[in-house]
Amino acid sequence: MIDYRKQYEEKLTTPEEAVKIVKDGMWLDYAHALSVPNLLDKALAKRAEELNEVFVRGYLIYHPIQILEANKRLNRDVFVWNSWFMQGQDRRMAKEARAFFVPMRYAEQPEMYRRPDDVETVDVLFIQTCGMDQNGNFNLGPCIASTREAIQR
């Protein structure tokens, strides 16, 4: 039988180590709403000085995104935010010319990931989850509108 707990502990790392996978020109997907990867966002923002033109997709963001605060701090667009749904936080970012809007209906989002012409690529998916269960599974939480499709991409 596979010892999932051992595998989990061997792969467990810090947010600072995890974001080292991000390179210039990559497309990142931030999970949305309650699954926004806050610790990874903060760690990635600390790497802003060493990165250029990292594209990020996300939506239903209810608090300031640290990577975009890093853009302001550096006075350059290291991280290019692409919002799938404009709500309060996204509108504020768009007014400051810090966000692009990708219009669609909410129900279309999973299909966008299935069609390569609509979503170019998903190089990295950042998502906040709860801890692993005894069977090696992670609960992705209540915010899964297109998470499965993003993972499969």
Where are these regions (language model features)?
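Conserved alpha/beta enzyme-core scaffold
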Residues: 1-153
